[in-house]
């Protein structure tokens, strides 16, 4: 069995960043629609981005000046997948932009990305974001929610982070060494 894109990027980042004092870890980013999508829209919808306990305003975030990010995987939870298949959540794709203008990736239909499905569709490639670049996400629905009770859509992303701020503060690296994948 071959390594996942996440593991490949993680190994690559560790190898390339160690001589420069970079600290590598993985985290999750959550992207959600603000409400249920009950009619197919002609334009993509903004996604609210959450990183850990922080919900960011708008559908964009600026990568910190001391970090490089790689989006390596995207998936939906089992309850979200069930809601999509029974019509309680819309189906569609996520459009991922860099600096607000360059389309970096269009995900597969989110109905094909259930975490519980071993044959699920993964991202075809990792998407790299350099320091100070802007990550923007939109949801482009292809099939609206049809159930009488509908829910917002939520998609989870795995992010491999190379953080060079630890090179300037070695004590910080020791404290957070347990966060490594």
Swiss-Prot record:
It is found in: Virion. Its main location: virion. Keywords: Capsid protein, Virion. GO terms for cellular component: icosahedral viral capsid. VP4 self-assembles to form, together with capsid protein VP10, an icosahedral caspid of 87 nm in diameter, with a T=43 symmetry and composed of 420 hexamers and 12 pentamers. VP4 proteins arrange into hexons, while VP10 proteins form the pentameric densities located at the 5-fold axes in the virion. The stoichiometry of VP4:VP10 is 42:1. This is Capsid protein VP4. It comes from Sulfolobus polyhedral virus 1 (SPV1).
